[in-house]
Amino acid sequence: MDKFTDLNYTLNVITLMNSTLHTILEDPGMAYFPYIASVLTVLFTLHKASIPTMKIALKTSKCSYKVVKYCTVTIFNTLLKLAGYKEQITTKDEIEKQMDRVVKEMRRQLEMIDRLTTREIEQVELLKRIHDKLMVQSTGEIDMRKEINQKNVKTLEEWESGRNPYEPKEVTAAM
């Protein structure tokens, strides 16, 4: 029975649209007929599509206000796109989501900057310690015997036979 009621309602709306269009067509100066016909078709389609959708959404949803708001915004955005506008209507929730996303990204960037700054400070401190260790300090006279590892080398007076044992000897070989 509901289907017949919807069918009668649809036929009545179509009849109303046809009579409106015939009234408009009687005016010979009407140049905007295709635009008006398109708008009326879109409005009728939106009307027929949105009412059952809204009924189902309101019955199944716990937060009906958000559903109505979302459907209304979607319908207006569709109409704006059909009219050729690039702008869209945004709800407060979408703006808050975008702001939360921006704030989250800023926090992530700040944490990264803090980590990088901490690393750079640690590197600078390490370089300072390395520089301090590499600084040349004058100690006055340096004992070169220890530097060239000659601690156990004996002087000429300390040799037993008085001659240098490291001097080359004359060697004769038998043939």
Swiss-Prot record:
Cytoplasmic side: 52-175
Pfam families: Rota_NSP4 (PF01452)
Gene3D superfamilies: 1.20.5.430
Positions that bind Ca(2+): E120, Q123
Major place of residence: host cell
This protein's UniProt keywords: Activation of host autophagy by virus, Calcium, Enterotoxin, Glycoprotein, Host endoplasmic reticulum, Host membrane, Host-virus interaction, Ion channel, Ion transport, Membrane, Metal-binding, Secreted, Signal-anchor, Toxin, Transmembrane, Transmembrane helix, Transport, Viral ion channel, Virulence
Chain ranges on the Lumenal side, renumbered to this chain: 1-28
PTM section of the record: The N-glycosyl content is primarily Man(9)GlcNAc, with a small amount of Man(8)GlcNAc.
Spans through the membrane: 29-51
GO BP annotation list: monoatomic ion transmembrane transport; symbiont-mediated activation of host autophagy; viral process
Places the protein is found: Host rough endoplasmic reticulum membrane; Host membrane, Host caveola; Secreted
GO molecular function: channel activity; metal ion binding; toxin activity
Bilayer topology term: Single-pass type III membrane protein
Residues glycosylated per entry: N8, N18
Function according to Swiss-Prot or TrEMBL: Plays an essential role in the virus replication cycle by acting as a viroporin. Creates a pore in the host endoplasmic reticulum and as a consequence releases Ca(2+) in the cytoplasm of infected cell. In turn, high levels of cytoplasmic calcium trigger membrane trafficking and transport of viral ER-associated proteins to viroplasms, sites of viral genome replication and immature particle assembly. The secreted form acts as an enterotoxin that causes phospholipase C-dependent elevation of the intracellular calcium concentration in host intestinal mucosa cells. Increased concentration of intracellular calcium disrupts the cytoskeleton and the tight junctions, raising the paracellular permeability. Potentiates chloride ion secretion through a calcium ion-dependent signaling pathway, inducing age-dependent diarrhea.
Family per record: Belongs to the rotavirus NSP4 family.
Domain remarks: Binds 1 calcium ion per tetramer.
Protein name per its UniProtKB record: Non-structural glycoprotein 4
